[in-house]
């Protein structure tokens, strides 16, 4: 991709207008292959890195600087909200999201509370502020679908078959719906 690519190509296409080229961006997961990512990421969990605004901003900027992509993707993870409200979930290297105590009972509802972004995730807000001041391309963010995040909480780890989740949906639909 050319370093002269239009910073508005993504916004042009997003608003239904033609652009001089198809916009390109680099998902966070792909960023793991960048040598500069491996150099700055260091040890510790991804959540540790996300909680450091300068580091998270720098990682977000890496594909933009290297490839001149048309949008940046916020360095984050779909479990940040559950972790931020104290659920006890982390991202284990080579495994993915792992819950300390999976969500299985009505009592587990007490472990969840509404997210207050300013109180619970000030590091995300600060990262976004930094990026808004530095980026010349749009900033994209992502979120996990309720089923995906809910399944991580219920299963306690990544699952291909979601048996515990399906059992809860079938046997305890009120509990499942409350989680959703």
List the predicted regions and their residue ranges.
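N-terminal basic, low-complexity leaders that serve as flexible interaction/assembly modules and, when applicable
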Residues: 1-93
């Amino acid at each position: 991709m050319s370093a002269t690519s239009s910073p508005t190509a993504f916004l042009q296409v997003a608003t239904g207008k033609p652009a001089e080229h198809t916009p390109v961006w680099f998902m966070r997961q792909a960023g793991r292959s960048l040598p500069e990512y491996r150099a700055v990421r260091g040890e510790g969990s991804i959540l540790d890195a996300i909680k450091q605004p300068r580091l998270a901003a720098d990682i977000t900027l890496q594909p933009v600087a290297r490839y001149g992509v048309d949008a940046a993707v916020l360095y984050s993870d779909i479990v940040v909200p559950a972790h931020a409200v104290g659920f006890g979930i982390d991202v284990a290297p080579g495994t993915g999201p792992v819950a300390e105590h999976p969500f299985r009972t009505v009592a587990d509802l007490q472990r969840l509370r509404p997210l207050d972004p300013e109180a619970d995730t000030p590091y995300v807000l600060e990262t976004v502020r930094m990026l808004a001041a530095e980026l010349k391309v749009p900033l994209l963010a992502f979120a996990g679908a309720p089923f995906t995040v809910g399944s991580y909480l219920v299963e306690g780890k990544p699952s291909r078959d979601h048996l515990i989740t399906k059992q809860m949906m079938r046997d305890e639909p009120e509990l499942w719906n409350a989680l959703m």
